[in-house]
Curated annotation (Swiss-Prot):
One GO term (biological process): G protein-coupled receptor signaling pathway
Reported tissue expression: In the hypothalamus, expression increases with puberty in both male and female monkeys. Robust expression in the region of the arcuate nucleus (ARC).
Modified residues (Phosphotyrosine): 86
Known function: Metastasis suppressor protein. May regulate events downstream of cell-matrix adhesion, perhaps involving cytoskeletal reorganization. Generates a C-terminally amidated peptide, metastin which functions as the endogenous ligand of the G-protein coupled receptor GPR54. The receptor is essential for normal gonadotropin-released hormone physiology and for puberty. The hypothalamic KiSS1/GPR54 system is a pivotal factor in central regulation of the gonadotropic axis at puberty and in adulthood.
Name of the molecule in the record: Metastasis-suppressor KiSS-1
Family membership noted in the UniProt record: Belongs to the KISS1 family.
């Protein structure tokens, strides 16, 4: 259970760091609007995992590890598709 909790924490940290990093970019003023919406979805999925993850580590450790990478990939794909749409 400890091993599963470690990668989840690293993934959550990466999500937290990705949000301010995108917002810090001055050139992408229109992009943060789209990325912020997607980041909120990711945060909403990660926040319950953190709060409910502490009491139910065994139950959420396996599903959270499986659920986290799937949304990340989907979010990245959505960003790639959304950004060019805004640019055009």
């Amino acid at each position: 259970s400890v091993e599963n909790s470690r990668p989840t924490g690293q993934q959550l940290e990466s999500l937290d760091l990705s949000a301010p990093w995108e917002q810090s970019l001055p050139c992408t003023e229109r992009k943060p609007s789209a990325t912020a919406r997607l980041s909120r979805r990711g945060a909403s999925l990660s926040s319950p995992a953190e709060s409910s993850g502490s009491p139910q580590r065994r139950g959420l450790s396996a599903p959270s590890s499986r659920q986290i990478p799937a949304p990340q990939g989907a979010v990245l794909v959505q960003r790639e598709k959304d950004l060019p749409n805004y640019n055009w």
